[in-house]
Amino acid sequence: MSRLQFQLQATDGAARRGQLSFPCGTVQTPTFMPVGTYGAVKGVLPGQLCDLGAEIILGNTFHLFLRPGLEVIADHGGLHGFMRWNGPILTDSGGFQVFSLAHRRKISEQGVTFAAPTDGAQVFLGPEESMKIQKVLNSDVVMIFDECTPYPATEDVARDSMELSLRWAQRSRDAHDALDNDAALFGIIQGGVHPDLRGRSLDGLQAIGFDGYGIGGLAVGESESERNVILEYLHPRLPTDRPRYLMGVGRPEDLVESVARGVDMFDCVMPTRHARNGQYFTGFGTVKIRNACYARDVDPIEQGCGCPACVGGYTRAYLRHLDRCNEMLASMLGSLHNLWYYETLMANMRAAITAGTFFAFRRSFYLARGLDPPPLP
């Protein structure tokens, strides 16, 4: 039996408010998962993540397998002990990272052979290997091993990729069960931007049976409208008693629009990556701190923000100075701000769904940016 219990608590249109319960903690949904690629969210301590409102984080199976390796992580009793995070952890399967290697990989029915980016050594990864790795990591949510369909892709290419992922899904399920792993196992819906293929993928995954469903193969170059069409197609077809995870999609606008279309879980490197590039998220848009207009600006990043950077009184001028000097404190403070913004955005959406005011919240979100909300179906 899976260690995950999911409870759907409220809906407002397609937007869903729920709770994921694990032995190590509960997660309120919709939720945003900070990304700890190498076992750490860049520049942020685990205790700080908790203070910012994060309840679950993502670890990267592919990178942790290559470095430091499973033996080191096993010495710590798994990823929780290794990175000193006591809450739930979701690990991806490594499929997307293998996809990103492009010309350095070879895909077969059995799995993927690739040149490791660390030392060039030939490495094989398939469904069984991915499940074994994630068992050692001892994550609370395990993702199946799949092929991320490229974009653009013809319908024939997308179909072949989706069908391969379905065969790998069955092997992932079998391997996960054979390992007696009580972590939740999520399937991943593929099919490119072709709704009928997405539907076939979902049907096949439901026939196998999973604890939740990831929506993969998006945020790879498709337009926002193409993505929304897929989400709108899947929403009435997905089981209501299972969490839905949109993988790798992370602009604030994307989160709002995807919650409006029934998504429960998100992850993205954007908050910390943008902070390292001097871009800070606010309710009125993005502050690009490298612009000259901030050179003598004594305001915080955003008035009324509760993050350590803004509450601490660090001014835009100071942050710009740090950024221009390549001082690591700039990216640390920026990451704290951006993650606070994301977690607060999710908390505000949860409250609005519970109150039945999500679509009023959505309108105000766009109006604060001087924009009109995009149309909903």
Curated annotation (Swiss-Prot):
Substrate binds at D92, S93, G94, G95, F96, D146, Q190, G217. Binds 1 zinc ion per subunit. Zn(2+) binds at C305, C307, C310, H337. The keyword Zinc applies. Keywords: Glycosyltransferase, Metal-binding, Queuosine biosynthesis, Transferase, tRNA processing, Zinc. Its EC number is 2.4.2.29. GO terms for molecular function: metal ion binding; tRNA-guanosine(34) queuine transglycosylase activity. It catalyses: 7-aminomethyl-7-carbaguanine + guanosine(34) in tRNA = 7-aminomethyl-7-carbaguanosine(34) in tRNA + guanine. Residues 248-254, 272-276 are annotated as: RNA binding. It holds the Pfam family TGT. NCBIfam families: Q_tRNA_tgt, tgt_general. Homodimer. Within each dimer, one monomer is responsible for RNA recognition and catalysis, while the other monomer binds to the replacement base PreQ1. This is Queuine tRNA-ribosyltransferase. The gene is tgt.
